[in-house]
């Protein structure tokens, strides 16, 4: 479950208006699988506030984040992705990660940020709905897939209502829960009681 660089550290981007529900399945279960989760914000030590009003103090400043020190960058959605270009540095960092062969996972509003950055122009992807991304003026509409979550190489995308499918694709890319991902998904997505025994067997 280590990246090609040998690290098991997963970096979670945090910023004001972050959508709290979108990344919890992924981060909690990656931590249970042995990954270290570190938060990355605009400024290290300067709190950000989520949609729920929860304050998070980032471990690391975005400027100090290097792809070679990471197994994965997760970009949660946030209202600020639809309010201007304040979060553009995060999608620029996503480009640096992808250029370095390090995976990026983006959900909800973060997919619009990737679209504006041009990172969806030639990759299969999804989001909330196709016309949400079309409004960005991006050139990748032909690669839009109407699915819960989509993994194309090192890029994972999902819409805001699919945090479980989003997590499943992240696990698959990092090789977590081999042989148990289907049971995990059925338990948390479908509330299948039989999956509990499979997951914990």
What are these regions (language model features)?
Residues 52-60:
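Short gly/ser/thr-rich secondary-structure transition/capping motifs
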Residues 18-23, 47:
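Short N-terminal binding/cap micro-motifs at the start of the first secondary-structure element
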Residues 39-40, 45-51:
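Membrane-interfacial amphipathic helices and adjacent loop/beta segments
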Residues 2-19, 28-42, 59-105, 109-201:
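Active-site-adjacent pocket-lining segments in enzyme domains
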């Amino acid at each position: 479950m280590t990246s090609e660089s040998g690290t098991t550290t997963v970096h979670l981007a945090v910023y004001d208006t972050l959508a709290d529900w979108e990344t919890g399945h992924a981060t909690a279960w990656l931590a249970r699988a042995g990954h270290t989760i570190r938060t990355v914000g605009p400024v290290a030590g300067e709190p950000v506030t989520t949609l729920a009003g929860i304050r998070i103090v980032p471990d690391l400043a975005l400027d100090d984040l290097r792809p070679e020190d990471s197994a994965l960058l997760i970009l949660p959605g946030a209202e600020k992705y639809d309010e201007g270009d304040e979060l553009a540095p995060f999608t620029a960092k996503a480009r640096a990660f992808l250029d370095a062969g390090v995976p990026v996972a983006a959900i909800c509003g973060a997919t619009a940020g990737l679209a504006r950055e041009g990172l969806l122009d030639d990759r299969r992807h999804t989001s909330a709905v196709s016309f949400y991304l079309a409004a960005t003026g991006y050139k990748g509409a032909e690669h839009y897939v109407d699915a819960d979550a989509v993994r194309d190489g090192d890029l994972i995308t999902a819409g805001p209502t699919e945090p479980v499918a989003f997590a499943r694709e992240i696990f698959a890319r990092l090789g977590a829960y081999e042989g148990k991902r289907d049971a995990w998904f059925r338990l948390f997505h479908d509330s299948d009681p039989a999956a509990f025994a499979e997951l914990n067997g």
